[in-house]
Amino acid sequence: MSVYHLPTLLNPLVNAIFNCPEPERSPLKKLFANLKTRRFILLAPPSEYLLNYHDVKSKLPLHDLCYNAEFINSYILLMTENSYINTNSRDSHYETLDGKTVVIQWKNNVIHALNGFHIRRRLKILETKILPNFNDYFEGAADFIILFIDQPLNCEFVPNDYLQCFHNYEKIPKNAHAMPNLSIDSFQQERSSFENILHIHPARLTQLGQLFSSYRTLAPGDDPSRSIFESIVQQAFDGMKSDSLFKNFSNLYDLIHDYFELNLYDDIWSRLTTHFKGHEVDTEKYKYFSVNQLLTDFYSKDYGEFKLHDITLIERRLHLASKHLQKLALTHSYAEKSKILVETLQKLSGTTEMDSHQLELPDGLNNMTMDADTLISLFVLVVCRSEQKHLKSHLYYLQNFSNNSSSTKFGILGYAVSTLEAVVCYFEDFNKNTGNVAKANTLCEKTKNLLDKLSCENPTNEVEDLATYKDILTYRNEQGQSIPSICITNHKNYILLDILSEYENDFPVEDLLEDETIDGSTLLIESIKAGNLEAAKVLIKIMLFNCTEEELVSYINKTDKYARTVAHYLTHEMDILKSIGNYIDWKRKNSSGQTPLFSIFRSYDQPNYEEMVKTAFDIANTWYRKHNSLFDYLDHTDNKGNSLLHVLKTNIPILLQLTKLDINEENYKGLTPLMVYVKYKRLSNIDAITKDRRLILEKVQNSTFFTCFDYAKDHSVLSKIGERGVKDSLFGLIYFHSLRYHNLNATTNITSVSNAEKPFATTVINMKTIQGLLRSILKDNPFTFLPLNTYIDEISHLNRSDLTIIGKTDVTSLLHQLTNCFNVLLFLKKIPENLFTDEASILYWMRINTSKRNQKPSGKENPKTMEPEEINMIQSFLRFNFDEISSFKASLNILRKVLIFINLKSDDFEDAYKGLNEMGRKLINSEASSAFKGIITNHNMFSELSLAELLENVRFLEQCTIQLSSFVQIILFEKIPNWWKHYGEFLALHKSYRKAFPNMVKPKSASDTSSRAPLGGFIETKREQSEQRLAVQIKASSKMLKELGSEIFVAHERLAEELSNYMEFRKACLDQRSLVAFATTNISVLQECV
């Protein structure tokens, strides 16, 4: 027999096991023989590892080990009956071919390599694939499951030498941490060792306890007594430094100081707060201090130099610093206090990394000069807003309870402590000046009054004496809100209009454009968030009248801390959308990866949803055209892989009209748009998308192997998607879907063409009824080319209530086969069209059919005598058909393998391209690395939809052809040769009879007797007995010939009828429903990719 070499697969392990051209000569022939009739799961590491890494122990490349049976055995999981049970409460245990134990957590997509593995690993399932069997040496299953795992299983592996050129671009693991500070780490180790020694030696603890007691006794209740604290620390140090237990500690004094501080902090802090009681800084009276009051230098700048943008950035730093300084109240040591203080000043001055939103801002505060006076003024605001109640106590502690007095005088900590001291002095000096206090009180009271009038709790919407508040109109609260912003938030629109019209010099358009809160919200964003559409329209009118197009685009696309523009907050504001839509950057994504169009599409609670969606889409389309491009659907996919189709609630025809649209695209959970619609019962969307020819109805969710039918809980939804299934079926007549279990009884939903009022009907039928129907049809058509016995057997195994991925694949395969089978039966009119209206109709038809079958006369009562000429004619007819069927079967075999490999090699091409791109980006040479970014290729020669449909039809046609060929083969090579054998024996008996009894016309009956003479009678009796024996043999041979001939005749008649049916089915299936459909679908889908 000729050896056909199929193309090599990219993954060496998959190729070694499934794609061996000569299994009898392969080094894996024993493994192939062992697995010949077994079902198994293959664990496949990524091709990147198998092709580019080698085993540490053997030094062999991993791709060479893929042809080593000992290596392969660990990757093959044998399947038992338990493999089909979905154990949500426990893990699924499997045994490898060499007896090792593997546990799979299907829910988490995790594999644990346990008993037998010398390296126990936790592996991640990257992808689950169903591989159609294309070889001839595995007979255990038509499909095999491959679990692609994130790394090799049973070996230590390292990259090959040639990967060294990629070394500098190696990926950093997600869980990798920065290198620790060795000095800090060493000190922590010493501290841990120090405390362990103290706990091991109670005597030492007792001595230290006595020192703690002496401090609590000697120190006055209102005096922290730094000198007493330092004295007992020194006393402890003197007693320990000569002790051999502590001689190896390089920082013994610091360790002792910290230990004493830890144990005496509460006592020290209590004395401190008592000591400064009545003298602490009271920040309540400065509650309404604002940036404009302290940073007078900024506000006194010339009009051309002053930028409100600088103030908004200062506000953000103030907010961060204030939040951080609040942690000071939670500290319990000098180290903690000093750390908080330094970090607060760093956040305030901008010397540390701010949040990502601030880092991306252009011309930020980092470019501003931050002198000491400015820093102190800002720190005053930080203290006021953090509401610190024991500021002097913290300052005193920082100045007096350090283990190194120089640290508070020099360096960054010294600067921080002196800044805090200056702030405390500021408050003290401020309180000593009665004029300042009076002015502050007046200003505070005035600010409070204005804010009360602007409060949402105040019903009035106007301020009669607005002029009296002119000097505080530049006030900004701790959230960074200006007076106009507060008016907008609290819907004080009349006051807002008064302010903007009467005090235009204080609020020029430039300031309105730069007015932002600490979270980056502009006035327009604030108005939309507050639902103040009137204020929004006022602002838009001002902007449109006073700003250039460039300024409008810049302002409308400003983002807040969530990277949202004003358009991301639009839900039902139709008029506003129309007025600013042309200035929106429709491709701008927020922190969740959502564009404005995406946000509008998923705002489901708006009353005019469809109109809003249509308007937004039209405006976005216009915006794309304005920028000389076509609407790009891929621009609007969020960080979770959701597309516009996934989130659109209704009116999806506006998207389905797009040409470059993947309507089967999966999000990161593996859900297609149709699955989402089915899950949330969006009937109008289901109706629209099921009419689109690009839809792949049974797209499988990779992690669970669910299809859209698994998410359907409603009969109307099942009926709707079932109708599409009928249209996609082989002859468009019937479709089996949605297998369910009720007390271990399996039922299936069947959608079929109906003659009633509705064109389709969906019914629930018990699988046992389907099984009985198949048996009844098989009795009527024993030579049918449909493999009914196979389906009957598979239905018998449907007794498992919960199915894993393995079971689901079997169920899906069975439902597909039943769909094809009953499509053919209906196409050939073997069963009535209205049979599946309900289960009672099926049972009734089966009873009637059985009754008719029992009334038919049996062919055995009148066997037909066949002549050699007739047998020759039958033999010639069957041989001709057998040769044709065999040739066609071989062609189908080749076509099936080609279709499988087109899909496999497309995936290989994609994986190889991704791997090449990934490696290219890691190249040390930056110029060479950048060259890989420009590689663009299209590996999709055929659409996924058209390939899947054609492969399924070819596989079914091949099964039918094999079934019919086996019947022809039995008659042609067993029954007819047997007839010729008996016919030859019959002729030989006749020849022997004529030779022995030439005068006999025909053999005598055994009952014929006559009287003879004694001697002559004896001879005659012997002669008659011989003649009778031959006569009996001739009669038996004749009877056998008649039975065989009758059996061949009946089989020939039925086979002739079945061959006619087969030819009719084959032509319709292959020509119209397969090749033509494949070409049509493929052309239409690929045209959209051009």
Curated annotation (Swiss-Prot):
Annotated GO biological processes are: early endosome to late endosome transport
Q: Name one Pfam family in it.
A: VPS9
Q: Name one GO cellular component term.
A: transport vesicle
**Extent of the signal sequence:** none
What GO molecular function annotations does the UniProt record carry, in alphabetical order? guanyl-nucleotide exchange factor activity; SNARE binding
Where does the VPS9 domain start and stop, copy by copy?
A: 289-436
Family statement: Belongs to the UPF0507 family.
What this protein is called in its record is: UPF0507 protein C1Q_01007
According to its UniProt entry, this protein's organism is Saccharomyces cerevisiae (strain JAY291)
